[in-house]
Amino acid sequence: GGVKKGIAAGALLGIIAEVALYTFWLILYRKPKSAEEVRACLDIPVIDDVKTRKANEEEVYKKLALFLKEKQGGADHKGVSVNCMPVGYFKKDAGLKLAMSFANEKKKTLLIDLVKEPEGKEAGNSISRYVLGDESRPVPTTQNSYLDVLCRDVAEEKNFDVVMNERFASYVKEMQDTYEYIVINSPNVAESADAFAAGKLCDKNFVVCARGGVNNETLYRLKNEAAVQGIVLEGVLVYEL
């Protein structure tokens, strides 16, 4: 009898362990059910939980700008660099919207958009050409009195690592003497190492994601990779898509 009971108990424990493991994988690979779940995966504050259809985007990015300022002690330091790290599928323009928010406050801002291509071959606003050794410095496109924009030219890069290049790093550092804010709009963290390379150069890093465009496992990987690379994530902007 004791042996049978032991076998039954062992089988039951095995089933419980399997269910627990299955539940763990289920939770790990599912999409986060709430902003709180995103917060738990990344272990950083939720800057805003955006109900997309009703959202006033201008207010959202004002809130983000204020959050990032508070994180540096509330003072307007000259030349603060901020890296936008989108994870999963959804937001490609969060960096632009943040840069516009800084510019609206009359802060001289440079956006380096690593997602957007430059306007044609003759455009002088490509950071790629400069990093690849072009003697002439990039000429940012002027969006308004307070906002300048640089893009990248992926085709011209030919898989050369532009963001990890020393010329890119020194350019960002140099621009901190000219601009009050430098915003780097990085590509999707899940698909490119550029966001981490840019993150190492910046004073502040924040994450943006849509709940419908990311799973928990990707969020855990982002948290761990940032920790390994010594990148502090200030907070996350969550869209309820």
Q: Predicted regions span which residues?
A:
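Short boundary/hinge segments that flank catalytic cores
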Residues: K5-L110, L114-D148, E156-V162, E166, ...
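Switch II (G3) loop of P-loop NTPases
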Residues: V149-D194, G199
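Conserved Switch II/interswitch segment of TRAFAC-class P-loop GTPases
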Residues: N185, V189-E191, C202-Y220
